[in-house]
Amino acid sequence: ALLRALGIPRTHWVGLSMGGMIGQTLALKAPELFSSLVLCDTSSRIPPEAKPLWDERVHTAETKGMEPLVEGTLSRWFTAPFKERGGAVVETVRGMIRSTPPAGYIGCCQAISGLNLTDRISAIKAPTLIIVGEDDQGTPVAASKVMNERIQGSQLVILKSAAHLSNMEQPDAFTSALTGFLGKRS
């Protein structure tokens, strides 16, 4: 509805993590809106055995706020060497996590924990690029390989020395993969 309201007839969707989950959902519901789809560090399904982890995060945010979630999230989102080096990127993300409203975080956790699109994504016909950090724990390479197998003609790029925020850990390699893909479709 937003794209239509803005008068945007078609778009190149680039979605990271939950943004990739949203992109898959929208591409299934309104395929005519997509010139291409880039799915970054995301998944088409969260396994049922992961639900208790998501429930625990919800409980923590409800009862203690965001602070207790900060360091664990950073450890999942960045490789250990990158996190240890710290720097402005890690500090910026640390601040973003701290300033996330718990209610918004809880809603996202609940949406993510119920995701199950794998059996439907073969219907995605838009040219699709899948990018994943080789060390992504939350949406691992195996999940990207499933999407790559199911979405006909999709391309898979695995970035070395990167976890869940591969765009931040390996910005040059990420941007090269992204612009190379989009450059052929603009």
Residue ranges of model-derived segments:
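Alpha/beta-hydrolase active-site loop
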Residues: 1-3
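Conserved hydrolase catalytic core segment
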Residues: 5-48
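Conserved alpha/beta-hydrolase catalytic His-Asp/Glu region
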Residues: 45-53, 63-123
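Short beta-strand/loop motif that positions the catalytic acidic residue
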Residues: 124, 130-132
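Short alpha-helix in the alpha/beta-hydrolase fold that links the catalytic acid
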Residues: 126, 140-149
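Acidic catalytic loop of the alpha/beta-hydrolase fold
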Residues: 134-139
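Catalytic active-site module of serine/aspartate enzymes centered on a nucleophile-bearing elbow/loop
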Residues: 154-186
